[in-house]
Amino acid sequence: MVVYKSLKPLAFKSKDMNHLPVFWRANNKAWVTAQIFSDWFTNCFIPQVEMYLKLKNLPFKALLLIDNAPGHPTSLKFQHSDIEVMFMPPNTTSLLQPLDQGVIAAFKAYYVRRTFQRLLKNLEEDPELTVTQGWKNYDIAKCLVNIKESLDEVQPSTINACWQKLWPEVVLKSDKIDNLNTTVNQIVEIARNVKGFDEVNRDDIEEMMLNYDQELTLEDLEEITETPNEPKQSEHDEEEEEPVKPDFSSKSIKEIFH
């Protein structure tokens, strides 16, 4: 699921929004609220799980394990008789949640690598293109392509190994998690070929990926419920941004990807 600030950005002007590679929703803060998460549960999770189980000739019974984030409503526990929804204990996400045991880290690494690869390719194909223009050309449509391709790159062994702490009996080999060191090294090598990133190092990349995760707090949700929550229908409605002087030092690499 991807939550954006606009229901139909300019980059999707000629696209069918029902055939995007992600479950697409929007609000003016680009936050996953309880309403959006319930929408995902009903219109994405349930149909896809049902389709998968039919392909495997399995009965429609499923378990959804989620953390206690403010945007995850407890009412989901009673929404479908064939799906059991369980919430993890508070403050255990980083320790137990399967996605936090290697899957998210692998996805982030693949996404960052593909982003730098795309930028470098564009610069090589058009010598007159500046790095600033290259970043500006990276719109939400290209972002979704990267998201889909990065998710597809996550190996089944990585997904299997993520259950090591909660369900070790089903893990085939706990050492099968993707070699992130290799991927991070590849990112550094690619980034250093881009003008302005020649001083990027492993610490910059690893810190950037660690800072991706910022869960909503209760205060965040209170703010979004107290202010108008309707997403922009189109990016035509957005105010024109003032030009920002580009900073491509290693210290600014995190901000570029946020």
Predicted regions and their residues:
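Acidic, serine/proline-rich intrinsically disordered regulatory segments
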Residues: 2-258
